[in-house]
Amino acid sequence: ATGRDDRGQALHRRSVDGPGFPCRHCLNLGEPGEVMLLGSYDLPHPQGVYWTPSPIFLHENDCPRFDAEDAIAPIVLANGIVSVRSYDAAEMCLYDLGAISEGKDVAPILARALADPRSRFINIHTARPGCLLTAVEKL
């Protein structure tokens, strides 16, 4: 651990004092009093014209990596409004599959995107600040 984010900036330590602290590693929300690290993350996908870094939170202390298959991440379900962005093999955004919804209502949107033969992967972001919550890939 370097104490720096993917852009070379110092990580910010934040104590959880309310909603809005989703850990990008375990995909759970931070609990009140826990310390979270905030920094920029260079998304591996999409590359090209849709590439962008994203602010993310991580627990300061070790947490288990979320690795469940066929499950929606807790930080998605708990989020009031998410943006679902589907991409093809050329890493171009499939606008017709994109949607904004409450996290608890994302299952049919994901199912539709995953069923589409053009989709290679889907990124789910917080709709307001735009932070990456998780990436979904076809197996």
Regions found by a protein language model. Give the residues of each.
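C-terminal edge-of-domain segments
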Residues: 132-139
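Short, hydrophobic/π-rich interface segment
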Residues: 84-121, 125, 138
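Short Gly/Ser/Thr- and Asp/Glu-enriched loop/turn motifs at secondary-structure junctions
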Residues: 126-131
